[in-house]
Amino acid sequence: MLCDSSESVSFSSISKEEDTPIARLLKNAKETPDHRFISVYNERGIVAKYTYTELLRRVNTIAKFCDDLGLGKTVGIHMGHELDFLCSIFALWATGRTCVIFNQIWSQQVVRVLVKRLNISDLLYHEYKPKFEVDTLNATSLASLPLDIDAPCIRAGLEPEVALINHSSGSTGVPKSMPFLMKKYALGYDYGTPEFMNHLSTPMVMATSFALTTLSWINALYCNGNLLYPSSSISATCTSEAERLAWNVYYALRAGCERLIILPNLLVLTLQIMPDKEECFPACKLVAAGGEMVPANMYHTCKRVLPNATIYPQYGTTESGLVSFLAYNGKDTLHNKELVYFPGKTVKKLMLVTEDNEAVPEKIGCEGFVCVVTDVQSEPYVGDDAETIQSRNSTFINYDGQPAVRFADLAVWNSYKGKLGITIKGRLGRRVKRNGVFFDLKYFDQVVVGLKEVKDAFSFFIFNRFVLVYVPAYNGVDPVTLKQKLNKELRDHHLFSSCFPLADIPRNAAGKVDLKSIETYASKCLSVEDQRLPVLLNPVAIEISKIASKILQNPSLEGKDAPLYSCGLDSIHSVRFFHAIQSHFHLEGPIRYNMNSNCTPNSIASIIQKKSYNVSSITYELLNEDACALSRTIPKLSILPTNGQYFLLTGATGYFGRRFLEYLVKLNISVVCLVRESSDEAAKERLISLVPSLRISSENIIVWAAHVEEIRFGLDDAKWEFLVENVSRIYHMAAEVHWMKSYQELRPANVLGTKTVLELSVMGPKALYFISGGGQQEVELDDDTQSAKASGYALSKYVAELLCRKISDLGHPLIYVIRPGFIIANDGEILSRDFFWRFVATALRMGIWPQSDESQSLVFHISTTDALCMTLTQILEKEADAYAPLLAYDKFDGDEFACICESMKNVKLDFVTLEDWLKALEKDVDEKGEDHPLFALQHATKFALKSSMTPSNGLRNIYPLSETFLTKEAIANGLENLYIE
């Protein structure tokens, strides 16, 4: 029977801790008995409804049944989204019992462990009969339990101290058990985020044991919301469980759901399976997407289908209980903006901490593990096995005498609209650090699975190498070809060292992917591969292999003739490697510039023994011959009619390129952008993700996938002819910037790419503006000594400029070569690999600032993005001189720069000579190692800082000198965002 309305129950008089879910259910049944709390839907719409009155009757029935059976104190529930799922939980709580929600994918082994660990005596089920059998577990079906309208009404006050024992996913073995106290539900029922609009109707589409599921039904109960349950009879042809869930979401939207609390990837999958791509659901008011990383295009993909929905990326953990974070800048996810999460009001203290649980400074860019102090967290893990104890000690910590939860996720302090929050960087295990740079293995996995040759895949970082384990999509997939295709997709020909096929992905006892077994398999395959390498006999080569083995931390390379770049010798390790070789063999020449990407210990030994290391294999004469030979293949100047409607822009995704594109769009100029991607659609998505203001919705902006190193950029005949007929001006900015690669390695992109641009420019002719790098050496190579000292990047730019000169000499009237200085953004964005800001950060951290050897101020050649945009579009239109490279930078006083740094960063800088500063830098790099900002660029630092003293040889500077205020603005904005350790 229902509660007697004559009973003197005053719900308003109870304390907040006493306002348990049972008390709230009774309150709702009394005050709003006809409120529809649960609705069941299928593909035809709502097929059943249950009010609080009907819900309470079923709860009373199950509660009497539980007492009659004499169930134990801890009871398992093995159910899907069905009426008896919630009714059983309420009934068990009302009779003083703790609930454990069983996951349907748990194996017999996992169930045995959990039953023993938690002393579970009984299990309730209804539609879904358990597939496991445990001798000590009594399974009881509620399917045949009829409604008993005479069953006594439950009452509050008998609830157990522990309400639910939640569980982790179990991805590393047996799931961890987390008790959650009954009293905490009333303290944080809205998870501290009332923006969730808990009164809205919400479908239950994810696993019943999932933390977001508990969030949904608890806050719906406390806020008089409405739950939508998918009928088990929904008819849909599905190839996977994920697709079945996606159909459940789709039919919930058709049934009029107002809110989705959902996994991001499930939401995206739902939009993909929709039969009518033009269909939209204006009834949906809110989407909270959490539980996994948010795809960059989620907001914009959803906005058309859910036009009236507020879309929040959501973040939290099962361990933190009723704590939730929201990212209010979710709409910026496609605009190269990092999501910034803010905690709800249940968080008393938010910190980022080190592995030793020391708080990191609350400054933008500081990294640590997310840690919260709150009154509504779960209790520490239950269990006495070694792994549980270790996890418990590292997760549930004490901070200033208060219990706290340390998440497994790394994050950095960030800000949005002036408020400090956190940006999630991912789990430590799937996020690896190489040379001070973090790589997301999960991102690599997603890229690989997108290839047609791969069914499933996981990447690993072993012995400083990225390796892939994959399940082929069909027979005959060649691992070598797959590696080449993957590296091309990732735009780094040596990123992945090896690909190893696997028949199927192994699963652990919890049904999750067994990453440990896969990584062990990858390590064994890699070891076998290393053992097959040729054995070295040359003593010099053997010594070189020992050096490589030590630097790459891979003992198996010792004595083997291994291709070093494929074994993890990237740009930063190569600095240490070649420096070690020069020290070991007492060499004086710049041996690193003699190396190519296929170098091995034997090939390096050959160079050393021939004593050819001090003369570059690329001579001044060869560079000129290369330029002459290439220029002869470029067609002669031709006068062609052209519509001249478009500008062509290469390098639009670059640091300056994307800002220049924004500038052109503001001027209402039509632009064709060539973007390095696999398809036009991928090129558009990438460009939109980088250029916030860009909307590719008209013919004014055309985006094509292209590769500058390929013939005609890899475009088909129709696209090439379009460029010939419709482009009047070309801005060529695309380049491969790499300070350690040789000329031959950079020639395809930087030289042949410029050749293709010139081939297009002679058709018309079309005005060509070639932006030749930024801040690199301004030297005219006139002897082999200079060519031996120059980097491969500088050599490639030299030949590209030489090509432009030769075509200009043949009569092309509209070729401009522009040499900027160090390019810095007026909006303050700092490029992590940018030399200039690395130098500034180093100087501030060391507390000393360089001057010239005569104690005079250094001069920095700086080009701000705003001023450079004006230069390229306005000033150059007035230039009519004969061909000569044009300088485009502001000469900014170094001492004035130092004063700005002191003021904005509140530090005191001592001035020293450049030579003394470089000595201090060498010591600083030795102490900090490869994490030092200038580790990889130490060899180029002196030249870069002295570049202002290089004579300009009469070259004209066309930079708007009246715009010095823009330089100061860019410096100030950059310093605002610069993090100093």
UniProtKB/Swiss-Prot annotation:
Residues annotated as coiled-coil are none
Carrier domain sequence ranges: 535-612
Q: Name one GO cellular component term.
A: nucleus
Keywords, A to Z, come to: Ligase, Phosphopantetheine, Phosphoprotein
Task: Note one Pfam family from the annotation.
Answer: AMP-binding
Entry's family note = Belongs to the ATP-dependent AMP-binding enzyme family.
**Name by which UniProt lists this protein:** Uncharacterized protein C162.02c
This chain's source organism reads Schizosaccharomyces pombe (strain 972 / ATCC 24843)
Organismal lineage: Eukaryota, Fungi, Dikarya, Ascomycota, Taphrinomycotina
